[in-house]
């Protein structure tokens, strides 16, 4: 299951959960004291927010894969694209 991953640092988790829940028309798949994430299907994105950073904004981007074989395939595609 390949997904693009986006992680954003926010200052106010509750306010941000409310905003993104309205934006995505979905509740988070997981919520912790300092973290929430949505596993969206259209587009296929693992979208996460947390208060675990220095300042609000983009924390990191990535790809989510199920196993080492998918990771190797993705690595090969990235190397071929370069």
At which residue positions do the language-model features occur?
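Eukaryotic phosphotyrosine signaling hubs
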Residues: 3, 57-60
């Amino acid at each position: 299951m390949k997904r693009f991953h986006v992680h954003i640092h926010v200052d106010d988790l509750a306010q941000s959960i409310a905003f993104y829940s309205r934006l995505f028309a979905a509740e988070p798949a997981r919520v912790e004291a300092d973290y929430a994430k949505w596993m969206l299907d259209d587009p296929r994105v693992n979208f996460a927010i947390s208060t675990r950073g220095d300042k609000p904004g983009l924390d990191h981007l990535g790809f989510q894969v199920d196993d080492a074989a998918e990771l190797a395939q993705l690595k090969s595609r990235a190397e071929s694209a370069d």
